[in-house]
Amino acid sequence: MSNKKADSKPQAKYPVNLLDTPFPMRGDLPKREPQWVKEWEARGIYEKIRAASQGRPKFILHDGPPYANGDIHLGHAVNKILKDIVVKSRNMAGFDAPYVPGWDCHGMPIEIQIEKQFGKSLPAAEVMSKARAYATEQIEKQKVGFKRLGVLGDWANPYKTMNFVNEAEEIRALGKIIEKGYVYRGLKPVNWCFDCGSALAEAEVEYKDRTDPTIDVMFAFAEPEKTAHAFGLPALPRAEGGIVIWTTTPWTIPANQALNLHPEIIYALVDTERGLLIIAEERVEACMTDFKLTGRVVATAPGVKLANLRFHHPLASAHPGYKRTAPVYLGDYVTTDTGTGVVHSSPAYGIEDFMSCKAHGMTDSDFINPVMGDGRYIESLPLFGGLSIWDANPKIVDALNAAGSLLRSEKYTHSYMHCWRHKTPIIYRATSQWFAGMDVTPQDGGKTLRETALEGVDATAFYPSWGKQRLFSMIANRPDWTLSRQRQWGVPMAFFVHKETGELHPRTLELLEEVAKRVEQSGIEAWQSLDPRELIGDDANLYEKNRDTLDVWFDSGTTHWHVLRGSHKDQLQFPADLYLEGSDQHRGWFHSSLLTASMIDGRAPYKGLLTHGFTVDGEGRKMSKSLGNGIDPHEVANRLGAEIIRLWIASTDYSGELAISEEILKRVTEGYRRIRNTLRFLLANLSDFDFAQHAVPVDEWLEIDRYAVAFSQQLQTELLGHYEKYEFHPVVAKLQTYCSEDLGGFYLDVLKDRLYTSAADSRARRSAQTALYHLTHGLLRVLAPFLSFTAEEAWKVFQPASDTIFTETYYAYPEVAGSAALIEKWALLRDVRGSVTKALEEARTANRIGSSLQAEVAVHASGARYDALTSLGDDLKFVLITSAATVVKVDDEAQESVDVAASKYQKCERCWHYREDVGAHAEHPTLCGRCFSNLFENGEIRSAA
């Protein structure tokens, strides 16, 4: 280490111990950080951490894989840096905490990119080959971005869902859940995107406002006598009229097959200008106003009395193709919040409609399903064949009006389902898909998937705790999981299905293993090119390859199987200690992982779930291109340093939204400078200190040094408690207070006189340096998880022989005898010092003194304060940073005060104290007695400070 004098003017004659350090005041982070990234990689620092951690208890944070598409954004930075802080803090806490990053590689976004670049007519094999190449290129690009943020991990050996071994293990995982009896095939309404041409998972659906036509439509009486009887009438007063429904999806009217009423709601038969209308009694007044009609209630009946009545389709008079009737089915899901209290049911396009019609005896072959996968009606649909459903909406409204069935039509803005990729509206559409049944009893007769998953939620620790109820209610209320997708770039559901019955081949489990072996060698392309005869021989005449692929949420949702216990089983283990993602993953990765592990293992794949919020600007607005308020982590790293991003994330309560703006970054940068200046002071004042040669035993330290170490040890205990619970913002807040107030504002301030003016090798100075040595060890380690670049830079100056700070564990401070009493005593002294500082400031403002060293103070104190102050003896002046200090005993707190007077003595040229003995030695007329002693004799004796 360097031992240069920082200022040669006064020191030339009477030197002070003002030392320098190669740790610069300016961080110059954008320039230095990339050099550290290169050095960490070149020197294999991650591997050294792993070697140092060998044999310790494992802590596994399992990386939720980002999608291998596009540049990293601020949300990625938040996620990866939080993970890095967790992993580094767990390693330093004495765990073996590896970090294996991963990527999600299959699925629609990459297929879309390939279509954009090469068109839609590529053969499947070529789509796969180009998709693999594209994903690889994107991963490499993102990898550079993540490393630049200071994230340490096994970047040379990440997991990728498209690696052959992972693809093969996914097929084996599918085999496991089939064997256990969770998988079935059925016709069911699923989230369907016309642009994807595929079913969507719940997590791929987002809600946005959309304006649609809302219509009230009458289904005319088909059984007037039965209807009259249901209402307790001998006959209907008139023939015209019917039952009225309200819907926001006119396009579903052509597929109507039933009407739903609540069994307990009271329905009214209302005589109006448009005939007799059946409406829920409590909606009559609102509906009459909406329809611009006047009405008189003729009779009422509960819904249960109207069950099985039939009504004509509202387009029956418009085209013979609609000459059918709709029965009334009872359903508890019907409400009277809006509309008419009557729900029209198109079972192919709604979950509740589907369940209701199934419960009333309809079979799959009974369902009318005229909407094709691209969103157009089949050509044979009367009146609207070939039209897209959205284009058909106004035409259907017109046709209903012409048929005399329309009572009202207006525009309605509501929150509606959209595809998260295409941002286009989606629908429920009944298709034949493979499902994992939430309420299916498995083969072993055990608990259902829903029951097992809910138990898994209960057994998991949540950070923050509100996540538990959120995930619990999602699992409790979710439908069966649609496992199948109609895509090319995905892991195949590698079944052979009977050409006529759709049944699985009887040897399915065995065949899945055969396919998995081939995929392990050649990737999913092996299934694409497989001739069925190779595996099933002549059965190929009866069975064909299933063309569906697995939902990509199954890819990432089974990483606990194909990564933790598969491709990276030597480094990782099951279950993981922690999954850490954004709060949207309660319905995404947390959710799918829980379901797959519940099916395969009967438990959750994680012990803990940590969720963080999303980034917003300084005014709390979401970041968007239209607002122009987005912040690019690359730009910030290149301008201010990745360390500033890391400090911003660590200092923010991530359980809510994370606000960022230039003003916020400016404040973070100021906080960073304070920490850096503290480190620079510590390192400079240790630059001539060799612990082996100069360390002073604890029991010989000055009292304030023992206090500083005891206080720092107590603080570290608090900080490690926060780290343990993943509470990083209190860690940062307490460390910033520690650096600016406990060290900079007190201990280091008091220490300057002793460090600079005591004899270089005196016990007093070496005691201070020994304490600073321990403080620096402790401080750098607790900073390292979040201020990784700065801690490493300081560590290389502090411990140049050590490879890296990241192989260290949290510091074991030396034990200080009576530490609790010492901390309590010095809390009192610091309180008094605060009062003295205030009095000095008032004297300075009144021009009675210049600096605090020009002052002599008398502290009037009582009780414990008096005892604490007098125990310091003559060292009290050093604690108060005055040239003289006396203590006057008073009876009680009310009499306590501070008197400040300007010293009448001369100022020492070297230590700047005003002392009576300045010039006592004629040959040194500007030097005080203690400086003379420190320079030319045995040096002053201090005991406390």
Swiss-Prot record:
Named cofactor requirement(s): Zn(2+)
Xref: InterPro entries: aa-tRNA-synth_I_CS, aa-tRNA-synth_Ia, Anticodon_Ile_BEm, Ile-tRNA-ligase, Ile-tRNA-ligase_type1, Ile-tRNA_ligase, M/V/L/I-tRNA-synth_anticd-bd, Rossmann-like_a/b/a_fold
Catalysed reaction, written as an equation: tRNA(Ile) + L-isoleucine + ATP = L-isoleucyl-tRNA(Ile) + AMP + diphosphate
Domain of life: Bacteria
The enzyme's E.C. designation: 6.1.1.5
Protein's cellular compartments: Cytoplasm
PROSITE patterns: AA_TRNA_LIGASE_I
Binding-site residues, L-isoleucyl-5'-AMP: E581
Cofactor: binding comment: Binds 1 zinc ion per subunit.
GO molecular function: aminoacyl-tRNA deacylase activity; ATP binding; isoleucine-tRNA ligase activity; tRNA binding; zinc ion binding
Recorded domain comment: IleRS has two distinct active sites: one for aminoacylation and one for editing. The misactivated valine is translocated from the active site to the editing site, which sterically excludes the correctly activated isoleucine. The single editing site contains two valyl binding pockets, one specific for each substrate (Val-AMP or Val-tRNA(Ile)).
Protein name: Isoleucine--tRNA ligase
Species of provenance: Burkholderia cenocepacia (strain HI2424)
Lineage, uppermost ranks: Bacteria, Pseudomonadati, Pseudomonadota, Betaproteobacteria, Burkholderiales
Gene: ileS
